[in-house]
């Protein structure tokens, strides 16, 4: 018969093994459950979800509704994007902003025609304004000026630009219009490059952008800006320099792969980025970032359903 002390030691070791085994089973089960949930989340990728935000402003009375659609990258949701058009119609917007990367520079003639067809159907719902992104800039413009790796200005309209404008849309880049939305007077602009002086800027390249932004901001009207990359406005001194009521952006795809309740794992901003999706107040700016519709090349969206964004601008 074993001594009592030795018996108790064996008993404690048995308890330890049981605890470790239970912990291992729990860990493996959790990992398998997480993987299964991630695979299940891939089924969301053929649907379009609508996300809603509200913004109060003392510059409006009756208010208006903005629909933001970004980063389609030639994808189709239903034949001829019928699902996307249906979601846009259900949103009942007063204005539709296409926030860039809706198409690709390398798109075929047939893909260009499909995009023009989509624009025509969206124009039937509400006025459509198009901002450019890094993937479709040369679908709408034939040349650009650069500093290092940054595109700073664009020119030379293409056949696609002419086609979408004939369809009733307006392409805005480094330009703005004073328009009326649901009875509210609004200054609407489009601006892709950085709204701050970058280290690669020359005096000339920055001065051109600075003058445009000063002209754009010189109004008492509600200011709405389509800017594909939110980083163009939230970095450096841009939030303190430019008083813009609402900047609408995309570009991030919410990092493509996200974690439930946390958000994007990584995006160009870094790990667990702040500005990958949602509504933010930075300095004098309000920024809404749409997670967009497509994945990233061969990488599917995980825990990151494709979305369009509705922003209700209401009286304060």
Task: Give the location of each predicted region.
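Conserved beta-sheet core of the metallophosphoesterase superfamily
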Residues: 230-309
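Active-site neighborhood of phospho(di)ester-bond hydrolases with catalytic His/Asp-centered motifs
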Residues: 68-70, 95-101, 127-134, 172-175, ...
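Beta-strand-turn-beta hairpins that frame and shape the catalytic cleft
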Residues: 56-67, 169-170, 176-188, 218-222, ...
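Mobile, glycine- and charge-enriched loop segments
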Residues: 45-78, 215-216, 221-224
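N-terminal membrane-anchoring alpha-helices
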Residues: 1-60
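Binuclear metal-dependent hydrolase catalytic cores centered on His/Asp/Glu-rich metal-binding motifs
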Residues: 143-169, 181-223, 233-234, 239, ...
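Membrane-embedded segments
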Residues: 62-170
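Solvent-exposed loop/turn segments at secondary-structure junctions
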Residues: 73-74, 102-105, 134-138, 177-179, ...
